[in-house]
Amino acid sequence: MICGIDEVGRGCIFGPILSAAVVFKKKPSFIKELDDSKKLKKEKREYLSSLILKNSYYAFAEISNITIEKINIHNASLLAMQTAYENLKLNCSLVLVDGKFVPKITAKNVKAIIKGDSIIDEIKAASIIAKVKRDKLMDEYDKIYPLYLLKKNKGYPTKEHKNAIKKYGVLSLHRKNFKLI
């Protein structure tokens, strides 16, 4: 069994970092449609996410902005990937994570793959379901904090988001150790 893991929200200034772990039940028919979530249009991501969720074992992990502030974004990213794998509750023969660094995962064989979200199908799938889940979370936060345009910026430090912080202040879900805040 091969597990792919990726995280989203690393470059954000609002909300959690979110990670997903994916193991395909069998080789999916839509495998050629998979790509790095950042390269796909929203509609395609959501369509593929629904297919991935139906055809795989998966788990998520969220690391809060408070924890990010305590342990830094790098360690929070690794913790998110580790926790997503632990939440999967499967013993995989190979775990492939996107990036340069290997989280503390208790599998026999764990490898970090630079640009893995563009190369490895399981990581592509993890990238897609993680992004769709985090984007939906930002859409929900936008209903609570509409002045920050979270539905549009998804927590990233856009000009409009930074202007909203200047005008309305920092929220409890903002990552206060980022230089922009």
From Swiss-Prot:
Its main location: cytoplasm. GO terms for molecular function: manganese ion binding; RNA binding; RNA-DNA hybrid ribonuclease activity. The gene is rnhB. Residues 1-181 form the RNase H type-2 domain. GO terms for cellular component: cytoplasm; ribonuclease H2 complex. Manganese or magnesium. Binds 1 divalent metal ion per monomer in the absence of substrate. May bind a second metal ion after substrate binding. Belongs to the RNase HII family. A divalent metal cation binds at residues 6-7, 98. Its EC number is 3.1.26.4. GO terms for biological process: DNA replication, removal of RNA primer; mismatch repair. Its cofactor is Mn(2+); Mg(2+). It comes from Borreliella burgdorferi (strain ZS7) (Borrelia burgdorferi). InterPro entries: RNase_HII (IPR022898), RNase_HII/HIII (IPR001352), RNase_HII/HIII_dom (IPR024567), RNaseH-like_sf (IPR012337), RNaseH_sf (IPR036397). This is Ribonuclease HII. Endonuclease that specifically degrades the RNA of RNA-DNA hybrids. It is an enzyme of class 3 (hydrolase). Keywords: Cytoplasm, Endonuclease, Hydrolase, Manganese, Metal-binding, Nuclease. It is found in: Cytoplasm. PROSITE patterns: RNASE_H_2 (PS51975).
